[in-house]
């Protein structure tokens, strides 16, 4: 079982989002030692999931586990800021 669970809500996978996701996965592999699950959800295909998580804008990245739940809305291209905002940076 993974220690971290992340969900990314998107409207569609643009090249910018794809690049940000790849970079985020690489950093999570390094920072979280690969102990995470990462799910990408297209709100056009699964609007009920977005409604359940109260997603009002895309992209929205949600860290569900470990608690507390945290979210980043908007640009996810700066992975360091994203990891800091989600409280995922390793403590040195």
State each model region's role.
Residues 34-46:
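Thiol-based oxidoreductase modules, predominantly thioredoxin-like and allied folds used
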Residues 38, 49, 79-80:
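Domain-scale activation on soluble regions of proteins
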Residues 51-57:
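Thiol/disulfide oxidoreductase modules built on the thioredoxin-like
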Residues 76-92:
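Ser/Thr/Gly-rich flexible loops in soluble cytosolic domains mediating phosphotransfer, phosphorylation
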């Amino acid at each position: 079982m993974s220690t971290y669970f992340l969900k990314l809500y998107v409207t569609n996978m643009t090249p910018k989002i794809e690049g940000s996701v790849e970079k985020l996965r690489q950093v999570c592999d390094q920072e979280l030692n690969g102990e995470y699950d990462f799910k990408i959800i297209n709100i056009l295909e699964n609007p009920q999931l977005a409604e359940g998580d109260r997603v009002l804008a895309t992209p929205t990245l949600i860290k569900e586990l470990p608690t507390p739940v945290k979210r980043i809305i908007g640009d996810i291209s700066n992975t360091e800021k994203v990891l800091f905002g989600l409280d995922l940076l390793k403590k040195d």
